[in-house]
Amino acid sequence: MPGRFREDFIDALRSKIGEKSMGVYGVDYPATTDFPTAMAGIYDAGTHVEQTAANCPQSKLVLGGFSQGAAVMGFVTAAAIPDGAPLDAPRPMPPEVADHVAAVTLFGMPSVAFMHSIGAPPIVIGPLYAEKTIQLCAPGDPVCSSGGNWAAHNGYADDGMVEQAAVFAAGRLG
Protein backbone atom coordinates (compact mmCIF):
# COMPACT_ATOMS: atom_id res chain seq x y z
CA MET A 1 0.00 0.00 0.00
CA PRO A 2 1.47 3.33 -0.97
CA GLY A 3 2.56 6.14 1.33
CA ARG A 4 0.02 7.85 3.51
CA PHE A 5 -2.66 5.29 2.70
CA ARG A 6 -0.46 2.46 4.00
CA GLU A 7 0.43 4.40 7.14
CA ASP A 8 -3.23 5.27 7.75
CA PHE A 9 -4.20 1.59 7.58
CA ILE A 10 -1.34 0.55 9.88
CA ASP A 11 -2.25 3.28 12.40
CA ALA A 12 -5.95 2.38 12.27
CA LEU A 13 -5.24 -1.32 12.81
CA ARG A 14 -2.71 -0.65 15.56
CA SER A 15 -5.29 1.47 17.43
CA LYS A 16 -7.71 -1.48 17.41
CA ILE A 17 -5.48 -4.34 18.54
CA GLY A 18 -4.49 -2.96 21.92
CA GLU A 19 -1.29 -4.31 23.43
CA LYS A 20 -0.72 -6.98 20.76
CA SER A 21 2.57 -6.64 18.94
CA MET A 22 2.50 -5.80 15.27
CA GLY A 23 5.14 -5.94 12.57
CA VAL A 24 4.86 -4.54 9.06
CA TYR A 25 6.42 -5.79 5.84
CA GLY A 26 6.36 -3.86 2.56
CA VAL A 27 6.33 -6.18 -0.44
CA ASP A 28 9.25 -5.51 -2.77
CA TYR A 29 8.32 -5.06 -6.43
CA PRO A 30 8.12 -2.29 -9.04
CA ALA A 31 4.48 -1.15 -9.09
CA THR A 32 3.56 -0.50 -12.73
CA THR A 33 0.75 -1.51 -15.08
CA ASP A 34 3.18 -3.92 -16.74
CA PHE A 35 1.78 -7.16 -15.30
CA PRO A 36 5.03 -9.15 -15.39
CA THR A 37 6.53 -6.74 -12.84
CA ALA A 38 3.84 -7.89 -10.39
CA MET A 39 5.36 -11.38 -10.52
CA ALA A 40 8.22 -10.11 -8.36
CA GLY A 41 5.67 -8.96 -5.79
CA ILE A 42 3.80 -12.25 -5.86
CA TYR A 43 7.06 -14.15 -5.30
CA ASP A 44 8.20 -11.77 -2.55
CA ALA A 45 4.87 -11.68 -0.70
CA GLY A 46 4.27 -15.43 -0.95
CA THR A 47 7.78 -16.21 0.25
CA HIS A 48 7.48 -13.78 3.17
CA VAL A 49 4.09 -15.15 4.24
CA GLU A 50 5.31 -18.75 4.06
CA GLN A 51 8.51 -17.96 5.98
CA THR A 52 6.65 -16.01 8.65
CA ALA A 53 4.14 -18.84 9.09
CA ALA A 54 6.99 -21.36 9.44
CA ASN A 55 9.25 -19.26 11.68
CA CYS A 56 6.56 -17.62 13.83
CA PRO A 57 3.81 -20.25 14.04
CA GLN A 58 1.86 -18.39 16.75
CA SER A 59 1.65 -15.22 14.65
CA LYS A 60 -1.53 -14.22 12.85
CA LEU A 61 -0.99 -12.31 9.63
CA VAL A 62 -3.00 -9.55 8.01
CA LEU A 63 -2.32 -9.25 4.30
CA GLY A 64 -3.28 -6.09 2.46
CA GLY A 65 -2.87 -4.21 -0.74
CA PHE A 66 -4.11 -1.33 -2.84
CA SER A 67 -4.67 -1.51 -6.60
CA GLN A 68 -1.77 -3.52 -8.03
CA GLY A 69 -0.85 -4.46 -4.46
CA ALA A 70 -4.37 -5.85 -4.04
CA ALA A 71 -3.84 -7.85 -7.22
CA VAL A 72 -0.56 -9.17 -5.85
CA MET A 73 -2.26 -10.30 -2.62
CA GLY A 74 -5.14 -11.74 -4.61
CA PHE A 75 -2.73 -13.91 -6.57
CA VAL A 76 -0.82 -14.80 -3.39
CA THR A 77 -4.06 -16.15 -1.87
CA ALA A 78 -5.18 -17.99 -5.00
CA ALA A 79 -5.72 -21.75 -4.86
CA ALA A 80 -4.36 -22.29 -8.36
CA ILE A 81 -2.23 -20.58 -10.96
CA PRO A 82 -4.75 -18.73 -13.14
CA ASP A 83 -5.24 -19.55 -16.81
CA GLY A 84 -3.23 -17.11 -18.87
CA ALA A 85 -0.56 -16.59 -16.22
CA PRO A 86 3.07 -16.65 -17.35
CA LEU A 87 4.76 -20.03 -17.24
CA ASP A 88 7.03 -18.86 -14.43
CA ALA A 89 4.11 -17.76 -12.22
CA PRO A 90 4.58 -18.62 -8.55
CA ARG A 91 2.87 -21.73 -7.25
CA PRO A 92 0.05 -21.30 -4.72
CA MET A 93 1.02 -21.29 -1.06
CA PRO A 94 0.59 -24.59 0.80
CA PRO A 95 -2.94 -24.90 2.27
CA GLU A 96 -1.67 -24.96 5.87
CA VAL A 97 -0.37 -21.39 5.48
CA ALA A 98 -3.98 -20.16 5.42
CA ASP A 99 -4.27 -21.11 9.11
CA HIS A 100 -1.78 -18.32 9.88
CA VAL A 101 -3.62 -15.62 7.90
CA ALA A 102 -6.30 -13.89 9.96
CA ALA A 103 -7.42 -11.33 7.38
CA VAL A 104 -6.84 -10.03 3.88
CA THR A 105 -7.73 -6.40 3.14
CA LEU A 106 -7.92 -5.43 -0.52
CA PHE A 107 -8.57 -1.87 -1.69
CA GLY A 108 -9.33 -1.11 -5.33
CA MET A 109 -8.53 -4.64 -6.49
CA PRO A 110 -8.49 -4.71 -10.29
CA SER A 111 -11.65 -6.10 -11.85
CA VAL A 112 -11.70 -8.88 -14.44
CA ALA A 113 -12.27 -6.24 -17.13
CA PHE A 114 -9.33 -4.14 -15.94
CA MET A 115 -7.02 -7.16 -15.77
CA HIS A 116 -8.12 -8.14 -19.28
CA SER A 117 -7.36 -4.60 -20.52
CA ILE A 118 -3.74 -4.92 -19.37
CA GLY A 119 -3.34 -8.47 -20.67
CA ALA A 120 -3.34 -10.11 -17.25
CA PRO A 121 -5.33 -13.08 -15.94
CA PRO A 122 -8.27 -12.50 -13.59
CA ILE A 123 -7.74 -12.59 -9.84
CA VAL A 124 -9.52 -15.34 -7.94
CA ILE A 125 -9.19 -15.41 -4.15
CA GLY A 126 -8.75 -19.01 -3.01
CA PRO A 127 -11.48 -20.65 -0.92
CA LEU A 128 -9.22 -20.90 2.15
CA TYR A 129 -8.97 -17.09 2.17
CA ALA A 130 -12.37 -15.99 0.84
CA GLU A 131 -14.12 -15.60 4.21
CA LYS A 132 -11.05 -13.86 5.64
CA THR A 133 -11.03 -11.27 2.85
CA ILE A 134 -12.63 -7.85 2.61
CA GLN A 135 -12.61 -6.27 -0.85
CA LEU A 136 -13.32 -2.56 -0.85
CA CYS A 137 -14.08 -0.68 -4.06
CA ALA A 138 -14.90 3.02 -3.98
CA PRO A 139 -17.92 4.00 -6.08
CA GLY A 140 -16.72 5.07 -9.51
CA ASP A 141 -13.21 3.61 -9.13
CA PRO A 142 -12.21 2.65 -12.71
CA VAL A 143 -9.82 -0.08 -11.55
CA CYS A 144 -12.27 -2.17 -9.53
CA SER A 145 -15.58 -1.10 -11.10
CA SER A 146 -16.90 0.22 -14.39
CA GLY A 147 -16.61 3.81 -13.17
CA GLY A 148 -14.36 6.49 -14.57
CA ASN A 149 -13.46 8.49 -11.48
CA TRP A 150 -9.70 8.31 -10.88
CA ALA A 151 -10.11 10.53 -7.82
CA ALA A 152 -12.16 7.71 -6.28
CA HIS A 153 -9.32 5.27 -6.95
CA ASN A 154 -6.87 7.59 -5.26
CA GLY A 155 -9.13 8.50 -2.33
CA TYR A 156 -9.17 5.40 -0.15
CA ALA A 157 -7.22 7.14 2.61
CA ASP A 158 -10.03 9.69 2.92
CA ASP A 159 -13.28 7.81 2.30
CA GLY A 160 -13.64 5.75 5.51
CA MET A 161 -12.72 2.44 3.92
CA VAL A 162 -9.35 2.31 5.71
CA GLU A 163 -11.22 2.37 9.01
CA GLN A 164 -13.67 -0.27 7.74
CA ALA A 165 -10.80 -2.57 6.76
CA ALA A 166 -9.02 -2.03 10.08
CA VAL A 167 -12.18 -2.94 12.02
CA PHE A 168 -12.56 -6.08 9.88
CA ALA A 169 -8.92 -7.13 10.33
CA ALA A 170 -8.90 -6.44 14.07
CA GLY A 171 -12.07 -8.49 14.47
CA ARG A 172 -10.47 -11.39 12.63
CA LEU A 173 -7.38 -11.17 14.85
CA GLY A 174 -9.59 -11.64 17.91
Swiss-Prot record:
Keywords from UniProt, A to Z, are: Disulfide bond, Hydrolase, Serine esterase
Spell out the SUPFAM superfamilies in the cross-references. alpha/beta-Hydrolases
Which Cys pairs does UniProt list as disulfide-bonded? C137-C144
> Which of the seven top EC classes does this enzyme belong to?
hydrolase
Protein origin, superkingdom: Bacteria
Q: Which GO terms describe its biological process?
A: lipid catabolic process
KW Disulfide bond (keyword) present? yes
Q: Which Gene3D superfamilies match?
A: alpha/beta hydrolase
InterPro entries, per database record: AB_hydrolase_fold (IPR029058), Cutinase/axe (IPR000675)
Q: Which Pfam families match?
A: Cutinase
Q: Has UniProt tagged this entry with the keyword Transmembrane? A: no
Q: Where is the active site?
A: S67, D141, H153
| A GO MF term | carboxylesterase activity
Residue numbers for the site described as Transition state stabilizer?
A: Q68
Q: What EC number(s) has UniProt assigned to this enzyme?
A: 3.1.1.-
PANTHER family found in the cross-reference section: CUTINASE 4, CUTINASE RV1984C-RELATED-RELATED
Record's function text: Does not exhibit cutinase activity.
- Family, per entry: Belongs to the cutinase family.
* Protein name as it appears in the record: Probable carboxylesterase Culp5
Which organism does this sequence originate in? Mycobacterium tuberculosis (strain ATCC 25618 / H37Rv)
Which gene holds the coding sequence for this protein? cut1
